[in-house]
């Protein structure tokens, strides 16, 4: 009411002036002396500072216009408002194949990478084996602008054209008894007693090892085979490939005159768990150079003796498969190189020494070991790393393979199927800081392995328990 009264008084005063008839309105500078816009009552200096989102929208419910005053930006306001109204619709990561999610009110929008479409980027336009293995469970093959999935031996391609269905109870690579949340590793801190026993060694030892692994329970490492002689018992490991073939390291073959193979064993003190098999033939890669007569592993390391460190043992009688005895799957070379060896971890197992120069384990040990990139691998080794080798293991943690584990499996799991990716070969000490385990790269020998295995196919009897 006061402003209106003031205005009337001003107009009356102006009307009384001599020139009022011709000058009803004042110039702006004069008028502004009398007429001023009233400030908002909630803050004297609010117009001169940026908004406060906590005061405006958290402590009290705000409108979109009030939020806009705070952010002073349409895009930021829209992003905030979509979450503020009904939560973040992108929190569940609904966009497939690395699509980008943008939240909306009651919905979301996926921005797909090139080659994908659909509300959730779920449809692949241009399929590539280089992208998520073409969504194939096992093997992927490019065919023009499409891909073709196939499966390991003993599996059938699913109706969706991508999945692989086991054709029998004992198809390769099936870990029937899962670990039930158990990890194939120990805590980061090793018991002080064991730590003091880890002795340094300046000489590489090719007869490798499992240090600080966990006990492998019955059925958890069903592809494990062990090589035994009549004098020392277990001296090397191996991997079951089929009812009549076991993969191992070539340097293991030179350690004794008579070799037998045991499968299904997890505890050497319980003879009932293992099955002893006689050897018919042994195939050693022709490029492998055996150590000189009288050569001792721990005295001198001869690199040429451990390039092409691969051999295949043929059984006289077939291996009978069960829940505790199952072969590992043989990958294709491309699948191993492009998919399996780009996973974070592989799995090794064996009865080797529990620490360097220590006693051998009475129980089968298993350990997850990370893949190591080739440059780091080569820099860490005093001896050359050839194309038939790769590194795996820990830089500082005392976890590794050790003497007695040589020839054993390096397994990589993909979509719950376990594939053979390496053979325990050699290393510079056991769990030595800055050193890694060296493994034979199986992908380099896929054709050689298949050629050997075709020489004698399993009979109907040898295929018992496997389709």
Swiss-Prot record:
Residues the UniProt record annotates as site (Cleavage): 209-210
GO biological process: blood coagulation; induction of blood coagulation in another organism; proteolysis; venom-mediated blood coagulation
Residues recorded as bearing 4-carboxyglutamate in the entry: 46-47, 54, 56, 59-60, 65-66, 69, 72, 75
Residue ranges of the TM segments: none
Active site, renumbered: 251 (charge relay system), 309 (charge relay system), 406 (charge relay system)
Pfam families per record: EGF (PF00008), FXa_inhibition (PF14670), Gla (PF00594), Trypsin (PF00089)
Enzyme Commission number, as recorded: 3.4.21.6
Domain Gla: 41-86
GO molecular function: calcium ion binding; peptidase activator activity; serine-type endopeptidase activity; toxin activity
Job description of the protein: Snake prothrombin activator that attacks the hemostatic system of prey. This catalytic subunit is functionally similar to blood coagulation factor Xa. It requires a non-catalytic subunit present in the venom, which is similar to coagulation factor Va, to be fully active.
Additional note from the record: Is classified in the group C of snake venom prothrombin activators, since it does not require the mammalian factor Va for the cleavage of prothrombin as the venom contains its own non-catalytic factor Va-like molecule. In contrast to blood coagulation factors that circulate as inactive zymogen in plasma, venom prothrombin activators are always found in the active form in the venom. Hence, catalytic and non-catalytic subunits are found naturally in venom as stable complexes.
Family classification: Belongs to the peptidase S1 family. Snake venom subfamily.
Annotated protein name in UniProt: Venom prothrombin activator omicarin-C catalytic subunit
Biological source species: Oxyuranus microlepidotus (Inland taipan)
Organism taxonomic ancestry: Eukaryota, Metazoa, Chordata, Craniata, Vertebrata
């Amino acid at each position: 009411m006061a402003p209106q009264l003031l205005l009337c008084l001003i107009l009356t005063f102006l009307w009384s002036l001599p020139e009022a008839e011709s000058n009803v309105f004042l110039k702006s500078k004069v008028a502004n002396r009398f007429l001023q816009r009233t400030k908002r009552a909630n803050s004297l200096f609010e117009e001169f500072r940026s908004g406060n989102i906590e005061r405006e929208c958290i402590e009290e419910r705000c409108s979109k216009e009030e939020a806009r005053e705070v952010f002073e930006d349409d895009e930021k306001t829209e992003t905030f408002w979509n979450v503020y109204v009904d939560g973040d619709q992108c929190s569940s990561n609904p966009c497939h194949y690395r699509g980008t999610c943008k939240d909306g009110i009651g919905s979301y929008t996926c921005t797909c990478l090139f080659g994908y479409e659909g509300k959730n980027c779920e449809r692949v336009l241009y399929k590539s084996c280089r992208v998520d293995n073409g969504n194939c469970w096992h093997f992927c093959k490019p065919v023009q602008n499409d891909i073709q999935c196939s499966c390991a031996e003993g599996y059938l391609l699913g109706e969706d054209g991508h999945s692989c269905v086991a054709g029998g109870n004992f198809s390769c690579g099936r870990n029937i008894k899962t670990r039930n949340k158990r990890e194939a590793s120990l805590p980061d801190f090793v018991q002080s007693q064991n730590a003091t026993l880890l002795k340094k060694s300046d000489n590489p030892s090719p007869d490798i090892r499992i240090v600080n692994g966990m006990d492998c329970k019955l059925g958890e490492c069903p592809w494990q085979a062990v090589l035994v002689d009549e004098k020392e018992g277990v001296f090397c490991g191996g991997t079951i490939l089929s009812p009549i073939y076991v993969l191992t390291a070539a340097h293991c073959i030179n350690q004794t005159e008579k070799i037998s193979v045991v499968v299904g064993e997890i505890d050497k003190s319980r003879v009932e768990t293992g099955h002893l098999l006689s050897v018919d033939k042994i195939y050693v890669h022709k490029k492998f150079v055996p150590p000189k007569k009288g050569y001792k592993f721990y005295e001198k390391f001869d690199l040429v003796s451990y390039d092409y460190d691969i051999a295949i043992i043929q059984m006289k009688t077939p291996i009978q498969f069960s829940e505790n005895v199952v072969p590992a799957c043989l990958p294709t070379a491309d699948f191993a190189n492009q998919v399996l060896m780009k996973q974070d971890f592989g799995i090794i197992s064996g009865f080797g020494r529990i620490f360097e120069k220590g006693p051998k384990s009475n129980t089968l040990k298993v350990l997850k070991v990370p893949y190591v990139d080739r440059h780091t691998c080569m820099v860490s080794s005093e001896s050359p790393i050839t194309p038939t080798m790769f590194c795996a293991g820990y830089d500082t943690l005392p976890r590794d393979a050790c003497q007695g584990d040589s020839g054993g499996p390096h397994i990589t799991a993909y979509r719950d199927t376990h594939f053979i990716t390496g053979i325990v070969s050699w290393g510079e000490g056991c769990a030595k800081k800055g050193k890694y385990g060296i493994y034979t790269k199986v992908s380099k020998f896929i054709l050689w392995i298949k050629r050997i295995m075709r020489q004698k196919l399993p009979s109907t009897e040898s295929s018992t328990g496997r389709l």
